[in-house]
Each structure stands twice: as C-alpha cells, then as structure tokens.
Amino acid sequence: MSYPGYPPPAGGYPPAAPGGGPWGGAGYPPPSMPPIGLDNVANYAGQFNQDYLSGMAANMSGTFGGANVPNLYPGAPGGGYPPVPPGGFGQPPPAQQPVPPYGMYPPPGGNPPPGMPSYPAYPGAPVPGQPMPPTGQQPPGAYPGQPPMTYPGQSPMPPPGQQPVPSYPGYSGSSTITPAVPPAQFGNRGTITAASGFDPLRDAEVLRKAMKGFGTDEQAIIDCLGSRSNKQRQQILLSFKTAYGKDLIKDLKSELSGNFEKTILALMKTPVLFDVYEIKEAIKGAGTDEACLIEIFASRSNEHIRELSRAYKTEFQKTLEEAIRSDTSGHFQRLLISLSQGNRDESTNVDMSLVQRDVQELYAAGENRLGTDESKFNAILCSRSRAHLVAVFNEYQRMTGRDIEKSICREMSGDLEQGMLAVVKCLKNTPAFFAERLNKAMRGAGTKDRTLIRIMVSRSELDLLDIRAEYKRMYGKSLYHDITGDTSGDYRKILLKICGGND
C-alpha cells in the first residue's frame, strides 16, 4: 500500500527554494551550518531566522477548523498529500470506525475491528485461514532468533554443529535470566503468628496476675507471651506500663530466673535490638563468640543489618564496624565488616557470563594456585546476589568437579573457614544451616543454650517451620524430640511452645 507522494523520487525530496518558504527563511537545509561551541552561544539569537516564527504562526492558524494545510514540501510526481477531509481532522473518514474512548480498547486477544482479520493468539501462531508451516520451518510472524516451538518441559534442539548450552537447576540457556530460585522470604514460615482478637490490656492483666503475690504462674506467662507476635508483645509492654505504671521487663526479671528468664526476655526485645545485644555479648570480655557473629551477619537481610548498625550506634555510642575491628583481625575481620555493610546485591536476574567469570576467578584464587587469595572469595561471596551465587556454586561444581564448600575447607582454616562456609550454606539453604546449628547446640555433653535460644527466638516468625522440616530430613528425628530430651522445666516448655509442634 502506498500514499500519493510516497515514497520519494530518486535522490530524495529537493530542498525548498531559497526565500519565501512556507515557514519563512531561505529553505532547508541551510547552505552552511553554524559552528558548534560555547563561543557561538552568545550570537545564537542573531543566527536564528525570526521569519520562521511568523511563517509558522501564519500557517498553523490555517491548519485547524477545516482549512487546507499548505503544501510544505514539493510532492513527488503524481500528487501530494491527500486533501483534508470535510470537517477537518477532528472526524474520521466515513468508512473508518471512530477510535474508542480511553479505557475502551478491546482486551488482548479480543475481537479486532470490523472488517479486519482476527489476531494470532501468540507470536508465531498462524494467521486465521493460513495453514501451519512444515515441521522445522520458522512460523511466519515469530520473533526473530526464537527457537522452534516445543511442548512444555521440552528443550529445543540447537542447530546442527552447535553445542547445547549446559543447563543448571532452575536456569535456562540465555545469558541473562531470572532463575527459579525464590528470594529469601521473611515472615511467612514462622511458628508464631499474630494472635487473633488480640487485646494488649487484657494480656497485661494476665501477666500482672501471674506475677502478683506469692509465687509465679510460669505457665500463664508461657501461654501468653509464647503465642503473641513480636509486634503484639511490644504493645503489651506499653499497655502494662500504662495500666500499672510499672516496667514489665523489670517485673519479669525479678520473678523469673535461668534460661527460662533469658528466653522470655529474648522474646520481649524487637528482632533488631535482640541481635544488637547478642553481638555485644559475643564480643564482650576476653573471648569472642565468633560463631554468633558469623550466624547473625551471614543470615540477616540487608535491611535488618542496616537497622542493626543504626541501633548499635544508638545503644552503645560506638559503630558496629568499630566494635568488629576492636575484637577481630585479619581476613575474618574483613569478612565480618563486608557482611555488616548490608549491601549485598538483591537482584533476582542472573548473567551467566558473569557467573562463569566468577567461577574462574574463585578457582584461580583457590584450587588453581599455591596459597589462597582470600580477598577474591570475600569480594564475590559478600557482594553478589543470592540467585547469582547459587548459580556460581552449581557452575563451580560442574567445571571443577568439587563442591565449593570442600574447596573452602581445603583452602582456609579457623574462623575465616567457618565464616565463609556459613555464608555459602545460608545462600544455598538457610533453614538447613540453622538446623545444623541447632543440632550442634544440643549434641554431646552440655547444651549451648545461648545458641539454642537465639535461633529459636530469632527464627520463630520467619522460617522455623522450614527449619523443623530440614532438621527431620537431616537427622531423622524431630526438633521437638531433641529439645524435649535436652532441656527441662519451664525452659523446655517455652522452647517447645516456640517450636510449635512435633514432626
């Protein structure tokens, strides 16, 4: 289909004759262009043809209201632009349907305008009335470069002589893809959820009665605080002080003791403030609880870590980084400082070319050299996104035949080894990482109660259901069973309440 005057004659449209052009001035293009530069800006007003404006205004005034549009450019032989329809441009031609108003376009896949053929159902689908193309032939209208269509779950075969791109779990063969690895989810797999019909004043009264007079009703405290979300427990704190003019935390400290008291007080802190005091406790005194620092920094979200850093400065008038530097050293210190920035990439897209480059750099920094370039491991493991690093770990296994965790164990030692392993395990499977930590806390003689309390409380509203499932899968026994056998008294009762059930 063509229009009168289009396409242009050979050689293009001729320039307008000098002088008297419909827009004023001496035609276009000008015989010479002014030089470009700052020295030319001052004279710009003088270079601009003022007649353009007057000519434009004169012609625009006659454009609307049904007036004829001037022939701005010489037309090709055989005619110029078609004449303006009667009534101006405001109305469609008699044979044309009016454009539907805003919001009234037919939905995708709907019926086309009258007289038009129906649309294909998808890119590459045959036009109605046309036969399907032969097998192996690109359907007309398909997007260029697309592989031939296959059934769901079937991979298209590459052209002859081309090797298929290796596949990864949850990844396709494109260079930039969105993997099937879900981002870390928070707040939807916990054993403790917000209680329905919550009344903070009523709960404050229950707690007041439980601690009033001779003796303490520990079971009432367990039933109340063990079945409220953290947000609801903060409201109970405020309501208790409003109703009785007393600090609930001080009353709990005076009435409770031991690990039961520690667990209840942990429940009463906000998640961020709880971590702040756990970190402070880990670096206090002569020794350092490196495992606690690793666990917190390797498993928390960017947002949580940034809030933690601000809260630490508020509570102790010292930055979190200063606290880390004062109590750690070497590459382990650098690892913790990197993680404490809360600056990990949160993208869910994966660039496979970057994945392969990172794999090569990790291999060159460790297995493929004498000694280890720890800084390269630090840079990649602390900054790349979770989705990207899962792809890196899979590709590392494929290219080297060795799991990344085993390479870390071969190349590093001590706290740095444990820190790097924790990062990898959290990225691969966070619930499994915590299931292992819980099992180690209860394994053998004695119980690491701080670790047990910290994990049970901090994960109770996040992913404790998933941790329970991983624990059963990894150790053949339920978490509930092992807590029952390793603790006692009210301490056991509150932990089992948080656990939420037997598997």
From Swiss-Prot:
**GO function terms (MF aspect):** calcium ion binding; calcium-dependent phospholipid binding; calcium-dependent protein binding; phosphatidylethanolamine binding; S100 protein binding
Give me the stretches of Pro residues compositional bias. Answer: 80-117, 123-167
In the record, which positions carry N6-acetyllysine? K246, K253, K477
Q: Which InterPro entries match?
A: Annexin, Annexin_repeat, Annexin_repeat_CS, Annexin_sf, ANX11
- What keywords does the record list, in alphabetical order? Acetylation, Annexin, Calcium, Calcium/phospholipid-binding, Cell cycle, Cell division, Cytoplasm, Cytoskeleton, Nucleus, Repeat
For this protein, the record's Pfam families field holds: Annexin
Q: Where are the Annexin repeats?
A: 198-269, 270-341, 353-425, 429-500
One BP term from GO: response to calcium ion
Identify the stretch(es) annotated as Disordered.
80-172
The entry's localization annotation reads:
Cytoplasm; Melanosome; Nucleus envelope; Nucleus, Nucleoplasm
GO CC, alphabetical: azurophil granule; collagen-containing extracellular matrix; cytoplasm; cytosol; melanosome; midbody; nuclear envelope; nucleoplasm
Family as reported in the entry's similarity comment = Belongs to the annexin family.
- Whom does it interact with, and what assembly results? Interacts with S100A6. Interacts with PDCD6 in a calcium-dependent manner. Interacts with KIF23 during cytokinesis.
Its UniProt domain note says: A pair of annexin repeats may form one binding site for calcium and phospholipid.
Protein's job: Required for midbody formation and completion of the terminal phase of cytokinesis. Binds specifically to calcyclin in a calcium-dependent manner.
The protein's name is Annexin A11
